[in-house]
Amino acid sequence: MAHLSLNQYKCTHIIIHGTCLSGLYPVPFTHNAHDYPHFNIYISFGGPKYCKTALNTYVIPLLHRILTTQFIYTYANITEKSPPKSPKHKNILSFNNNT
């Protein structure tokens, strides 16, 4: 597997969507890199309250080992008041390579 530098390819983005329990989420995560140019990686999970703990314990450390130059930019915990099929209905973990 070749190493991909997001610093060289500004438009490169990785999208992961799912739940902490079952893996893939049935509704596609539709945000694109050009919608939010300062975001490079979107990780969207829905599920129980311990989902954030699972992300902090397993997913984030793994990504830090893979993407050693990437830094967590923001974490938005969206409430259930959002429309069910809206991308904002999920917990969004965003990485930024401009730090």
From Swiss-Prot:
Identify the stretch annotated as signal peptide in this record.
Answer: none
> What Pfam families has UniProt attached to this entry?
DUF468
Q: Which residues cross the membrane?
A: none
Please give the superkingdom of this protein's source. Answer: Eukaryota
Chain segments carrying region Disordered: 80-99
- Note from the entry: Contained within a telomeric X element core sequence.
| Family note | Belongs to the UPF0320 family.
Query: What's the name of the protein?
Result: Putative UPF0320 protein YDR543C
